[in-house]
Design a protein with these regions (language model features):
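Homeobox/homeodomain signature
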Residues: 44, 109-112, 164, 177
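A C-terminal cap/extension of S-adenosyl-L-methionine-dependent methyltransferases
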Residues: 140-198
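Conserved SAM-binding loop
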Residues: 1-107, 121-134, 144-146, 185-193
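Short acidic/polar active-site loop segments enriched in Thr and Asp
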Residues: 137
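Short glycine/proline- and charge-enriched loop/turn segments
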Residues: 106-115, 154-161
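Conserved glycine-rich, hydrophobic/aromatic-active-site segments
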Residues: 118
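N-terminal start-of-chain detector that recognizes signal peptides
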Residues: 16-18, 92-93, 111, 159-165
Length: 198
C-alpha cells in the first residue's frame, strides 16, 4: 500500500515502513530533517507545500506522529491530508493526552504542554469531534506507554530536585498503570475515512 508520514522528521518511521513493503512518501516542514532523511535513508521528503502534488484519494495510510498539536492552521491541514486518503483509508494520529494521570500529577510542569510550540492539546472528545466533522470514524485508541516515562523525565526537569530518573520512572510506571489501557501520557488514534468523508 501507499503511506504518507506527515511530519516525518529524519525519516526513521518512513524507512521502517519502506522495509515492510510500503510505498512511502514524507512531508516535513524543517529543512535539516529533510536533508537527514536523504543522507541517512535515501528518502526524498518534501515540504508541506508538496501535499498539493499528491493525487487525491491515492493513499492507504497517513501517519502524523506528534504533529497535529504543532499545526497552526488545523482545519486546512486536516482537510488537505484527508483529501489524499482513499475511501476507507486510515489516518493515524499520535498526540499528548492532557487527561493522563501524569498530566494531572505534574499540572503546569507537565512537559507535554510544550508551550508555545504546541498550539492545541487534544482530549479524546476533541478527536471524536474532529472525526465527526471531517467524515472519519474513530476505530481504535491505543496507549503509547513509553511516552509516559519520557514526558515524566522532562517534567521532572521542570520541577527540579534530586533523583529525577528514579522519580520519572516511578511516575511513568504509575501513569501507565492508572491509564487503564486507554489514558496514557500519549495516545494513538486510528481513524478511518468513511465512504462519505471528505
Amino acid at each position: 500500500g501507499k503511506l504518507l508520514d506527515y511530519g516525518s522528521g529524519t525519516g526513521e518511521f518512513l524507512n521502517l515502513a519502506r522495509s515492510k513493503g510500503w510505498a512511502v512518501q514524507g512531508i516535513e516542514i524543517a529543512d535539516e530533517p529533510r536533508r537527514a532523511s536523504k543522507s541517512k535513508y535515501n528518502l526524498e521528503v518534501q515540504s508541506p507545500s508538496a501535499l498539493g502534488n499528491i493525487e487525491d484519494q491515492s493513499l492507504d495510510v497517513i501517519t502524523m506522529w506528534h504533529v497535529l498539536e504543532h499545526v497552526a492552521d488545523l482545519s486546512s491541514v486536516i482537510e488537505g491530508v484527508i483529501s489524499k486518503l482513499k475511501k476507507n483509508g486510515m489516518l493515524v494520529l499520535a498526540l499528548p493526552n492532557p487527561d493522563s494521570w501524569d498530566a494531572n500529577h505534574y499540572k503546569e510542569y507537565w512537559a507535554a504542554w510544550d508551550l508555545p510550540i504546541h498550539f492545541y492539546h487534544f482530549k479524546k472528545k476533541n478527536i471524536e469531534f474532529l472525526a465527526s466533522r471531517f467524515g472519519l470514524e474513530l476505530v481504535e485508541i491505543r496507549n503509547m506507554p513509553f511516552d509516559s516515562y519520557y514526558v515524566s523525565l522532562l517534567s521532572e526537569g521542570y520541577v527540579g530536585g534530586n533523583f529525577k530518573w528514579i522519580k520519572a520512572a516511578f511516575i511513568g510506571f504509575v501513569s501507565n498503570v492508572r491509564s487503564g489501557g486507554h489514558n496514557a501520557s500519549s495516545l494513538t488514534y486510528i481513524l478511518r475515512k468513511s465512504k462519505t468523508g471528505a
